Amino acid sequence: MNYFDLPKIDLHCHLDGSVRPQTIIDLADEQNLTLPSRDINVIKEMMVAPETCPNLDEYLKRFELPGMVMQTAEALERISFELFEDAANENVKYLEVRFGPLLHQVKGLSLDDIMDSVVRGMKRAEAQYDIHGNYILSILRTMPKDQIKAVLEAGAKHLNDGIVAFDLAGSEVPGFCHEFVPYAQYAKELGYRITIHAGEQGAGQNVYDAISLLGAERVGHGIFIHNHPEAYQLVKGEEVALETCPSSNVQTKAVNSLSEHPIKAFYKDGIAVTINTDNRTVSNTTMTDEVRKVVEAFELTEAEYFDIYTISVNNAFTSDAVKQHLLSFAQ
């Protein structure tokens, strides 16, 4: 299999974890910000997580530099465009990018400007390359909840025209879903699809709650259903897709090694698994890398790869017309 040439779909990719290191330097210059270094190798080292981190919080430290420069409309549009450009250049045909709008208000940028900027960057890339995309609004579980409705209302202007879904992300504690029931309900009332980060850090119960309490149609990571039979059966029975991110899961110690990742066992048992990057820069990866790692580690056939590709298409938060286009690559 030529992994680069294969059509690919990435349903779980974070904007601020996928910024080009050179872009950090360029934007810091434009914004008169002082970086710890102007050496691209030093900047890259600060942005890329080690192959294994002691925990998820250590991994999340790599987002500090992007957060510094992602405070203007121009920066957000550029970073959005470049992410879709990078993905298109390795034959990613459809990309869903998630980002936390509330993280980009340090300098007073309005929610409307933030939404407009990322969607504009994406649409510019769609016009130039053979790629389709959408944005997912991520709310960090640790942030104050009083602004969640405002985020959802601002995003609604682009609903199904660049923005499609609501997500909860960040550090995962047991039982977090109970606090967010009214917000997920409001998102659904407005027309958002729902995907929730859950079961990334040991609590299979969180996956059960994400589906049963929040109405998650997909789950980010979800790998700890392997030690929670009720969550496992719910995911399988409801055909909830898991957005697995193999390299990231090894880095954050969700699994000890790729060979121990449950993706193959899940797939063989009929669970809807998808292959994704999580963070292209922080995990120092591409979709080509992720597909290669999974196919080689678990000896998947080309037919099995295209089956997983088709699962990704069927679970994408996009129109039937785009899905038909994406399925044409699997013929």
UniProtKB/Swiss-Prot annotation:
Residues involved in Zn(2+) binding: H12, H14, H197, D278
EC number: 3.5.4.4
PANTHER family registered for this protein in UniProt: ADENOSINE DEAMINASE
Name of the protein this chain belongs to: Adenosine deaminase
Keyword annotations: Hydrolase, Metal-binding, Nucleotide metabolism, Zinc
Cofactor requirements of the protein: Zn(2+)
Cofactor binding description: Binds 1 zinc ion per subunit.
Gene3D superfamilies noted in UniProt: Metal-dependent hydrolases (3.20.20.140)
Organism of provenance: Vibrio vulnificus (strain CMCP6)
